Amino acid sequence: FYCEVIMDEAGKMNRMVKNLLALNQLEFGEDDVQFERFDITSLISGVLQSLDILIEQKEAQVIFRHKNPIYVWADEFKVEQVVRNYVNNALNHVDVEKVIEIKITQENDMAKITVFNTGTPIPEEDLPHIWEKFYKVDKARTREYGGNGIGLSIVKAIMDSFGKGYGAINHTNGVEFWFELDMK
């Protein structure tokens, strides 16, 4: 039993250190951005496939209906980090109906990717702070799943390096996180 707890904590610590290193590189501009054209639909499908076991464990229903390729212009590796952080965040906070819906909308040469999860909305006073390093809305609940308040600050650093929009919107039945990418 103790060995499992130690291994679990070591894994959490390892992930946190890796995330901190990545965030540090992003914040200090030491991480090169490699812009390329890639299919965002395929990237999201791949992230969802890699999180299949976690999705099953959380008993979440993930809805992603896009099948046709949608090409965007960005750093594919970094966009994968953004998608992974948003989906992990949704999985950690999904509640009530346990539905996560991912959508891609296209307008004026921009693709907007949204990740919505049912559950409790983020208190309005906390919304501006969720992008800050180590900020946690619910300290007690975050401990349950091992959140460390770094994921959304990584999203912020990546999207700032792209010069593109991102954000979070409360709905009565959950929260929607979004980001935008150029299609040309």
Label each region the model flagged.
Residues 97-109:
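Short beta-strand/loop element within the Bergerat-fold HATPase_c
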Residues 90-91:
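Short helix-loop "hinge" at the ATP-lid/N-box region of the Bergerat-fold HATPase_c
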